[in-house]
Amino acid sequence: MALKQFNPTSPGRRQLVLVDKSELHKGRPEKSLVEGLTKSGGRGGNGRISVRFRGGGAKRLYRVIDFKRRKFDVPATVERLEYDPNRSAFIALVKYEDGELAYILAPQRLKVGDQVIAAEKADVKPGNAMPLRGMPIGTIIHNVELKPLKGGQIARSAGTYAQLVGRDAGYAQIRLNSGELRMVQDGCMATVGAVSNPDHMNESLGKAGRSRHKGRRPHVRGVAMNPIDHPHGGGEGRTSGGRHPVTPWGKPTKGRKTRKNKATDKFIIRSRHARKAR
């Protein structure tokens, strides 16, 4: 889908660039696949802010997406493509031959009327899902499971994809967008193709109000705060902060590695930081 630009009838429209959604469904979502969604306002279970600069925004309904794709050998037809306010990718409503409806992540080049299927071995065409052991090497994939039966976790946002680059001893090797090369069990499911809406990254909201509609509040810089609020705060007039960039809690930011999961380090063949170190 193309990008839409607007005549500069106001400052907010001058900068506005949106994805053209004219081909998407214009009605309500499928009622049987929708749940209520309570806003958190960036607060955790104890009521304290755990993520700053969140709150407000338009009311949403949660669309229940099938990330597992374990309904094997039953063809499904794409009924329509839809916008989903809870993610950057578009979603597709599919109807299985037995009458069941489901939402799946829409890959690029998937159209209304196309047939998709999940199987142990299926055609390599966008929207078809199968275990990694059944795919040809070099296939572009998305919605990849990290553990069998857990549901897809890798490459789910707009325009993302991974590539199957090898198989060995019960594991598949996949290359991620970040440059990371990692192993997952070859029984994990993945869907063929790249995720829809690749132009999402080129959108420009044009004005602060559109950010507020999405539930994002103003992001205040540390150097604009008082010393009590941030290590970069205070000073007479405008300052540069006077130290290496840190978080509000004093931990180094901008480039500091934060990964702490030694149990799964063995599955990472090449770190996403490897090419930067050269």
Swiss-Prot record:
Pfam families: Ribosomal_L2, Ribosomal_L2_C. InterPro entries: NA-bd_OB-fold (IPR012340), Rib_uL2_dom2 (IPR014722), Ribosomal_uL2 (IPR002171), Ribosomal_uL2_bac/org-type (IPR005880), Ribosomal_uL2_C (IPR022669), Ribosomal_uL2_CS (IPR022671), Ribosomal_uL2_dom3 (IPR014726), Ribosomal_uL2_RNA-bd_dom (IPR022666). Residues 222-264 are annotated as: Disordered. The keyword Transmembrane helix does not apply. GO terms for molecular function: rRNA binding; structural constituent of ribosome; transferase activity. GO terms for biological process: cytoplasmic translation. The keyword Transcription regulation does not apply. One of its GO terms (cellular component) is large ribosomal subunit. Keywords: Ribonucleoprotein, Ribosomal protein, RNA-binding, rRNA-binding. Belongs to the universal ribosomal protein uL2 family. PANTHER family: LARGE RIBOSOMAL SUBUNIT PROTEIN UL2M, RIBOSOMAL PROTEIN L2. One of the primary rRNA binding proteins. Required for association of the 30S and 50S subunits to form the 70S ribosome, for tRNA binding and peptide bond formation. It has been suggested to have peptidyltransferase activity; this is somewhat controversial. Makes several contacts with the 16S rRNA in the 70S ribosome. Part of the 50S ribosomal subunit. Forms a bridge to the 30S subunit in the 70S ribosome. This is Large ribosomal subunit protein uL2. It comes from Phenylobacterium zucineum (strain HLK1).
